C-alpha cells in the first residue's frame, strides 16, 4: 500500500511538472491603439499643431502627464511581454512613457513614418522574454501621394523559436467605409507579399499580426489574408453582444485584432493558447453613463479632455512552446 502511495505521488508530481513545463513562462503578446499620444512640441514636419502648447486643444503639461499616466496604467493592466502600439507620435514620448511612467522596463522599436498626422507604430518588448533579431519599417505607399503609417516588422526569438511580428495600423475609414476600402486593400496586398516571401523560405514560419485594421474579422480585406494561411483570432467573437474593442455609432466592432498564421496552431514549436485571448474590458475603460455609455472611455472628445484612456480597448494572447 505504501509503495502504491509513493507511486501515485510520483506520477502526480511528474504530471504537474510536465504540465507546468508546457506552460512555463508563456510569451504574452498584446496590442493597443493608444489614441493620439503626442508630445507638447510643434513639429513643422507633422500635422501635430492641435496637440502642441498654444494649439487648438489648449494642451498643458498636466494634460500631457495625465495622458502618459493613463497610458502606463493600461500597459500595467495588460502586462504583456511584447505589445504593439499605434498612434504614437515619436521616440520622445515612448522614452518618457517607459522611463518615467511604466512600472515595467520595456525596450522599444520605432521608426518615424510619413503619416500626415505624424502617428507611428511601436513595439515595446521585455528583453528578458524575447530576443530581437532584426526589425524594419515596411513602406505603405498609397496612390495619389496619400501619406499613411508604415507597417512595423520585427523578427524575434522566443525559447529558441523564430517569430515574425507585424504591427499594423491600416488606413482610416474616414470618408466612408466603402470609399476607403481600396486603401486597406493595398495594405492587405502589401502584407500578403511580405508574408509570402517569408513562407517561401520557411513554410512553417510562425507569424503574428497585431493591429488596428479599421476593419472587422469578416471584412473583405481581412478575409483576403486567408489565402496565405492567416486567420483572425477575433473571428469567434463576431456578433457577440457587447463584445468589441471599439464602438462606432453605437455598434461594437472588432477592428483591433491579433491575426496569426496557421503554423501557430499546428501543435509544433510555438502555439497560441486559444483560451488566453483577452480584451482588456474593465469597467474603468468604458464610459458608464450618458449618451456614450458603453463606449470606450477616451482621453479626448474633440478638443475637450475627458481624461479617460483611449477610444480603443487593448487585447492580448499567450504563446507557449510546445
List PLM regions with ranges:
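Bacterial Sec-dependent N-terminal signal peptides
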Residues: 1-25
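Active-site beta-strand/loop signature of hydrolases that rely on acidic residues for catalysis
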Residues: 32-34, 71-94, 124, 165, ...
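Structured beta-strand-rich core segments of catalytic domains in phosphoester-bond hydrolases
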Residues: 82, 88-164, 168-171
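Active-site environment of divalent metal-dependent phosphoester hydrolases
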Residues: 90-92, 116-118, 173-175, 214-220, ...
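Metal-dependent phosphoester/phosphodiester hydrolase catalytic core
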Residues: 158-189, 193
Amino acid at each position: 500500500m505504501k509503495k502504491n502511495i509513493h507511486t501515485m505521488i510520483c506520477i502526480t508530481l511528474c504530471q504537474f511538472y510536465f504540465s507546468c513545463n508546457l506552460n512555463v513562462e508563456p510569451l504574452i503578446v498584446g496590442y493597443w491603439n493608444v489614441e493620439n499620444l503626442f508630445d507638447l512640441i510643434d513639429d513643422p514636419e507633422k500635422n501635430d499643431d492641435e496637440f502642441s502648447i498654444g494649439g487648438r486643444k489648449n494642451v498643458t503639461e498636466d494634460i500631457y502627464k495625465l495622458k502618459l499616466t493613463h497610458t502606463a496604467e493600461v500597459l500595467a493592466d495588460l502586462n504583456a511581454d511584447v505589445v504593439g502600439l499605434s498612434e504614437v507620435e515619436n521616440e520622445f514620448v515612448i522614452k518618457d512613457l517607459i522611463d518615467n511612467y511604466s512600472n515595467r522596463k520595456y525596450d522599444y522599436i520605432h521608426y518615424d513614418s510619413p503619416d500626415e498626422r505624424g502617428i507611428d507604430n511601436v513595439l515595446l518588448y521585455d528583453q528578458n522574454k524575447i530576443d530581437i533579431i532584426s526589425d524594419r519599417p515596411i513602406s505603405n505607399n498609397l496612390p495619389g501621394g496619400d501619406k499613411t503609417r508604415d507597417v512595423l516588422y520585427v523578427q524575434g526569438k522566443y525559447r529558441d523559436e523564430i517569430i515574425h511580428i507585424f504591427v499594423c495600423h491600416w488606413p482610416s475609414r474616414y470618408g466612408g467605409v466603402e470609399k476607403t476600402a481600396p486603401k486597406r486593400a493595398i495594405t492587405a496586398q502589401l502584407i500578403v507579399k511580405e508574408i509570402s516571401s517569408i513562407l517561401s523560405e520557411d513554410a512553417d514560419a510562425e507569424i503574428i499580426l497585431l493591429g488596428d485594421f479599421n476593419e472587422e474579422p469578416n471584412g473583405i480585406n481581412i478575409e483576403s489574408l486567408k489565402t496565405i494561411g492567416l486567420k483572425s483570432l477575433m473571428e469567434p467573437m463576431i456578433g457577440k453582444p457587447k463584445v468589441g474593442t471599439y464602438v462606432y455609432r453605437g455598434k461594437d466592432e472588432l477592428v483591433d485584432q491579433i491575426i496569426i498564421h496557421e503554423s501557430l496552431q499546428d501543435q509544433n514549436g510555438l502555439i497560441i493558447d486559444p483560451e488566453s485571448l483577452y480584451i482588456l474590458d474593465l469597467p474603468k475603460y468604458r464610459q458608464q453613463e450618458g449618451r456614450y455609455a458603453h463606449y470606450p472611455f477616451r482621453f479626448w472628445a474633440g478638443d475637450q479632455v475627458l481624461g479617460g484612456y483611449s477610444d480603443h480597448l487593448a487585447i492580448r494572447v499567450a504563446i507557449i512552446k510546445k
